């Protein structure tokens, strides 16, 4: 997701608790890593007694003598009670007499960002009565992002001639990136309908305004191969950096929603869900508006409240991998959202993402050289190659580097770097443009490094080295003699794999590997950046294919839905970067499909159908089941 500096500055003033600019976040980072985020210790999870923990002669147990409490277990508790112990808190007590006003509608949407606006507008266009509540003021409304990733829009295929992609290939590749944990219906809706949703979003644009939207990584270089091993390169993300900004485009969509009858209540914040005693049904939401409370009752409450970026305790708990990779450095994101929408649902028993959780990139590490995250040969602190650098883009192939010893990663390439760079997979943290201006700029960095000799050049903002031999290049980058020998051997093995036509060591498609044989040679040494945060977190509430929030027993909570960064199921193992702008693309598309469903679908089916199904018959001839409960 791209972030324009002005929107980030505005957004930080309004909502942020973290003063980080995009420029400051990326400046001289050298290596983008995973790292800052993860899971808080689970309540009650002290070490259980083992079979050998017999009582001492005095009768006290080993646990007691060591000061540890006996393990009590967490069975029957909600995820909020276990995962949120110590930080989630209780629902606020708001008496009926404190409610100054009550409104009624079909659908109430909490949040007017990309997902919330799409949900409200589409539902209203389909005949629903919709109210949107938004914390920000209307005058100072801000939103993040410049790019909308999608597939097969008429804007792509007809206006720009971008080839249509096979949605079946896309769904399978995306599911691999999510280790099989992506919610399949959400993925299907995006793959099959994101192009439709994008065309709908820009339908109000003039032809001139549509022409100002830039398709990233288009046109592709001559002879470009879209197939990269098991994966494809998805080009054509819509960039709103010129002409109408994405913020202004979103405000236009809000205006269209208002014309369709949607009521927007700005400076209004949802604070408590209205629900029954057993937490199985939501019938409204209580909001704070200035010094008063307003209750909005509806058939459907949709949480589009953003992520958990400024709430480190929640971030640490829900995004476990990032927290662990950062060795328990508190997680923070630039979004500034506080996770209040997710917390509201968790307090009444809702589940969150069941996976490692994640954010936009801090689960992965790679040498972020002047070639961006180019998938050259990657070497660790020992000078050894250690992974398939070309496995589905840097946010997937970068998972292994994040776990390597030390805090240095090296990248090396040779004089014929242009064909390599122009055949990289498109996506997050890769080059966005393959035009002559971009290549000439990078060529200038190479020339500066060649002239700089052993001191290297930081003309690109990152030190780049150039030498006539691999050994000399290693010396310039400050490697020990033993490490230098490993590098020479790794480069020789790399070239041999290309010659043999198979990378038998790590399985990389040799069509994505380029020889390192022609002088001069270039090298980059990056410091592995661990911890500190990311652009935005991408894990939220567990939802069904209809985006209905799930509670105990994985049953959907009647009347409660989530979309955008408040919902899970999209990036359960962290942001995949399969295309630029895929996060906002999902916000738009899934908001579009959710609004349509809420206005026209059967909202009772998920909580009524199947209640009287017969229990499965159990055979005594197969494998025995678990022992009966004590």
Annotate each language-model stretch with its function.
Residues 99-113:
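Beta1/beta-strand and adjacent pyrophosphate-binding region of the FAD-binding site
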Residues 1-24, 39:
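N-terminal secretory signal peptides
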Residues 71-74, 190-292, 312-313, 497-520, ...:
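Conserved redox-cofactor binding core of oxidoreductases
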Residues 296-365, 578-580, 584-593:
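Glycine-rich loop(s) and the adjacent beta-strand/alpha-helix scaffold that form part
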Residues 272, 484-574:
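A glycine-rich dinucleotide-binding beta-alpha-beta segment and adjacent secondary-structure elements
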Residues 125-142:
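Glycine-rich FAD pyrophosphate-binding loop
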Residues 342-344, 351-479:
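An anion/pyrophosphate-binding glycine-rich loop and adjacent beta-alpha core
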Residues 103-105, 291-300:
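Core beta-strand elements of the Rossmann-like FAD/NAD(P) dinucleotide-binding domain
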């Amino acid at each position: 997701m791209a972030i324009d500096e002005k929107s980030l500055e505005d957004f930080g003033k309004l909502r942020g608790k973290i003063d980080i600019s995009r420029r400051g976040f990326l400046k001289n980072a050298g290596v983008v890593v995973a790292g800052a985020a993860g899971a808080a210790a689970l309540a009650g999870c002290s070490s259980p007694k083992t079979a050998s923990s017999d009582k001492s002669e005095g009768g006290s147990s080993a646990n007691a003598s060591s000061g540890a409490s006996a393990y009590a277990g967490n069975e029957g508790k909600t995820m909020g009670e276990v995962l949120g112990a110590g930080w989630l808190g209780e629902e606020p007590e708001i008496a009926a007499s404190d409610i100054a006003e009550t409104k009624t509608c079909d659908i109430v949407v909490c949040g007017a960002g990309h997902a919330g606006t799409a949900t409200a507008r589409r539902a209203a266009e389909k005949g629903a009565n919709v109210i949107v509540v938004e914390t920000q003021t209307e005058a100072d409304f801000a939103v993040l992002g410049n790019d909308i990733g999608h597939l097969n829009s008429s804007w792509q295929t007809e206006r720009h001639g971008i080839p249509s992609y096979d949605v079946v290939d896309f769904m399978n590749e995306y599911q691999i990136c999510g280790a099989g944990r992506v919610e399949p219906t959400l993925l299907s809706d995006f793959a099959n309908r994101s192009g439709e949703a994008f065309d709908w979003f820009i339908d109000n644009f003039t032809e001139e305004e549509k022409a100002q939207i830039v398709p990233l990584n288009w046109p592709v270089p001559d002879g470009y191969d879209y197939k990269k091993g098991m994966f494809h390169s998805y080009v054509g993300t819509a960039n709103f950096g010129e002409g109408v900004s994405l913020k202004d485009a979103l405000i236009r969509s809000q205006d269209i929603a208002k014309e369709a009858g949607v009521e927007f209540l700005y400076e209004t914040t949802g604070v408590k869900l209205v629900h029954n005693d057993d937490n199985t049904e939501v019938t409204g939401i209580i909001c704070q508006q200035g010094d008063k409370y307003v209750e909005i009752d509806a058939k459907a409450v949709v949480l589009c409240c953003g992520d958990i970026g400024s709430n480190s305790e929640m971030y640490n708990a829900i995004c476990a991998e990032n927290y662990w990779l950062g060795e328990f450095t508190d997680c923070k994101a630039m979004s500034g959202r506080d996770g209040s929408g997710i917390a509201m649902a968790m307090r009444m028993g809702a589940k969150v993402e069941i996976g490692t959780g994640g954010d936009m990139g801090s689960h992965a590490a790679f040498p972020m050289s002047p070639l961006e995250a180019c998938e050259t040969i990657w070497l660790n602190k020992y000078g050894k190659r250690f992974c398939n650098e070309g496995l589905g883009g840097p946010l997937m192939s970068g998972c292994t580097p994040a776990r390597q010893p030390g805090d240095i990663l090296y990248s090396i390439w040779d004089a014929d770097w242009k064909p390599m760079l122009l055949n990289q997979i498109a996506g997050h943290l890769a080059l966005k443009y393959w035009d002559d201006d971009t290549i000439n700029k990078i060529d200038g960095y190479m020339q500066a490094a060649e002239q700089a000799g052993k001191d290297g050049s930081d003309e690109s903002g990152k030190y780049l080295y150039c030498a006539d031999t691999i050994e000399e290049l290693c010396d310039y980058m400050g490697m020990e003699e033993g490490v230098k020998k490993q590098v020479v051997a790794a480069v020789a093995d790399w070239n041999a794999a290309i010659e043999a036509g198979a990378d038998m060591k790590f399985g990389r498609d040799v069509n994505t590997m380029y020889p390192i044989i022609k002088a001069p040679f270039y090298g980059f040494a990056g410091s592995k950046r661990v911890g500190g945060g990311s652009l935005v977190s991408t894990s939220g509430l567990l939802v069904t294919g209809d985006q209905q929030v799930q509670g105990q027993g994985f049953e959907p909570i009647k009347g409660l839905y989530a979309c955008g960064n408040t919902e899970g199921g999209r990036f359960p193992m962290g942001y995949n970067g399969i295309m630029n702008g895929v996060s906002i693309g999902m916000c738009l598309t899934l908001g579009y499909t959710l609004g349509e469903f809420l206005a026209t679908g059967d909202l009772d089916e998920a909580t009524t159908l199947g209640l009287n199904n017969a229990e499965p018959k159990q055979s005594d001839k197969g494998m025995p089941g678990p022992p009966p409960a004590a």
